[in-house]
Amino acid sequence: MNKALKISLIVFIACLATAGLGSWYAASFINPTQLTKLLSSTVKDATGRELQITGPVSLNLFPSISVKAEQVSLSNTSWASNPNMLTFKQIELDIRLFPLLKGSVEISRIGMTGLEANLQTNQSGEGNWNLTPPVLTGKSSATQTPVNGASNDSTDSTFVSIKTIDIVDAIIRYQDGNQAAKVIHLPKLSLGGAEGKSTILLDVQYEKFSLNLKGTTGSLRNAYFAWNQSPVKMDLDLDLTLNGKTLAIKGDIDKKPQVLPTFNIRLNSKSFDLAPLAGSAAVAGKAGGASPATPHKPQGNYFFSDEKLPFDLLPLADGVIGVNIAELGIPGQAPFTNFKTTLQFKKNNIDANDLSFNVGKGSAQAQISIAGFDGSAPKVSIKGLAKDFSLEQIVASADSSAKASGGATHIAWNLQGSGVSPHQLVGRANGVIQISVGRGKLDSKFINKGGDFVVTVFDAINPMRKQSNQTILECAVAYLPVNNGMINIQDSVGAQTDRLDITLSGSINLANEALNISINPREKSGLTTGLDLGGLVKIQGTLQNPKAGVNKEGVVNSAVSIGLGFLTGGISIAAENAKSLATKSQPCKTALHSWSDIYSASK
């Protein structure tokens, strides 16, 4: 062997042995009990909470000094329902040696097994995870300043040095106020840092949803402590998998002190489903608010939910998010294919001017704008056009048991509203929506999937519908103008079946969802008895609970016609039928408005 190489190996082994002996010698002076007390006091200074260790504590010397403790708990805030915010079956801390010799604790790695976290908010929206230590009283400000400063320096050094966090078999219980707790399982979480990068591996299970996040980012630790203090630039290269479907997240984030962050992010996927994301967003939206806020209490009796939308999750930033998803699953709907858009963020506004997707063989394009989303009444505007698809295509892909054939469909919308919930948005809405459906055959299962309102309308139009499993539709058109949440219908909703011409008139108040709709079905032959049974029916109640009532005006008109018919030998009845044929023989054509007046991509 080369002499120089031998000397190098001997020197290396000697250094390694010296370091090992030094570590053993230093560790021999470390008492686990005293170290436990030091850890508890450090956590107390950093968080204001009590750290208790009731199980055995062991000390390992190689490859680094580590303390392993069992049956560990961190106390909760005074108002929380559970006495402990965190409990651990086992926790392991890798501790830096030289700071320890000076009487301070710097942790480089935390490993946790069997973590149970009890997270909770109170009535004012404050979370128990706020670990800001209490401010000491009884001393002058001049005296407090240096003491607190020294304490903060010690506290910061304890946690800034953490490079790795490993969590196995964790359970997180989140309780919003007095509501039932949501249980989230965390089989694995690993955060590591090296060479200015952070590696992430996360597995989460919530109800029937599973989430996996893995990849690399710029240093999360550096970004956390440098945010708004010095320039931060982070690269993103992550894969988010929800229920087996993966979304690639790539891009960068740039943050300069006292300036809104900027970003350029790309989201790409062959197939992705929004249902799990919506469920996790609902939990994150409740758990994410650290500052006190006025609770938003849903009413629970509206068709359009009064549950607050997660506007608070939207970032105040300047940037771009490009989305390209080959197949996007939508809860309760047929999947969208070739879904593409570019989201433009500018402070508290978001615009998507190029949203496009396919449904079945049809296509859709839309423009969406959200303005002032950080305020009490964000403004939302949506307009778009969907065409060249059919009910048959949608039903075949969404529910194979509900059969339909044909039904070429065309939809255009141009709506604006404001508020924090769907109910507020529609209750203050202005604009118009138009739907046109061509010739097709609909079975009863398809109609029943339309909900209580649709079923009530069909039953009122045709009381014999339940005896037949199919409705032959010639056409249907609904032109619905909205003025401050009020929809007024006057021959702007019409339909034709193989037997009937149908028009609707009346109003829908979206603010309270009250219905006041008269149904006017006419036999195509015009050979009626003069008693229009459909004209006697009015849809009342609400969108959530529609009811078929009596149209008193229709009763009077029919009674007058019948009475005059007896007096005139049926002449008045024939005249009324002729008038009906002349004015309502083309209800779809009468209701249909120009598509370009509703939506134009150039507007």
Which residue ranges define each predicted feature?
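Extended terminal
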Residues: 2-12, 24, 228-241, 245-247, ...
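Generic short beta-strand segments
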Residues: 70-75, 115, 168-173, 324-328, ...
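Elongated, acidic membrane-bridging lipid-handling scaffolds
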Residues: 19, 136-233, 300-345, 473, ...
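Short loop/turn motifs that connect adjacent beta-strands in outer-membrane beta-barrel proteins
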Residues: 100-104, 376, 422-427
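Amphipathic hydrophobic-ligand
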Residues: 49-52, 78-95, 107, 178-193, ...
